[in-house]
Amino acid sequence: MSPSSLDELIDALRGLPGVGPKSAQRMAYHLLQRDQRGAERLARALGNALAVLRHCERCNTFTETEICQRCASPQRDASLLCVVEMPADLAVIEQTHAYNGLYYVLMGRLSPLDGIGPRELKFDKLLARVADSTVQEVILATNFTNEGEATAHIVAELLAARGIRVSRLSRGVPVGGELEHTDTGTIAQALVERRPL
């Protein structure tokens, strides 16, 4: 017996990050019962995004053009390249207004158990990106998870072998954070990475 349209919708919603079976079922019923216009708008927006979005030839993020606006901007510092895991990470860094260089988006992180290796993350494209000697420093801004650390380590080795200066985002106590509410691993790393005033 083939799955019903409702089952297919619920299963598709379950494929989204952080959405379990109950949440997927609630969303499906909500869209079908109470927000059909919203469901139609969502379907149109998703269809449009799938039709027009592609990867930037330089930084690998999503864009509607061959080269995204950031990569095409002469106001960006082309000597700095920040490597992030996902476009959402790029967006968070942009919101800080503290960085004006360029980016490279890996579209994931190394995860051998999931079959994600250097080829899937297109490390060769990253290496080609820094080969023209415009980039003077690569800032690794992968997440501080085991997979993110492994990804940063491998990328750092590949870049260092080519004479590229590599730096890593530092870790520490968050701004406005109180020590008693901060985990010991973060405090330990903040102590190791302390700096003089």
Curated annotation (Swiss-Prot):
Superkingdom of the source species: Bacteria
One short Pfam family name for this protein?
RecR_C
What residues does the Toprim domain cover? Answer: 79-174
Q: Which InterPro entries match?
A: DNA_Rcmb_RecR, Rcmb_RecR, Rcmb_RecR_Znf, TOPRIM_dom, TOPRIM_RecR
> From the Swiss-Prot or TrEMBL record, what is one GO molecular function term?
zinc ion binding
Query: What does the sequence similarity comment in the record state about its family?
Result: Belongs to the RecR family.
Cited function: May play a role in DNA repair. It seems to be involved in an RecBC-independent recombinational process of DNA repair. It may act with RecF and RecO.
From the Swiss-Prot or TrEMBL record, give the protein name: Recombination protein RecR
Per the UniProt record, the source organism is Aromatoleum aromaticum (strain DSM 19018 / LMG 30748 / EbN1)
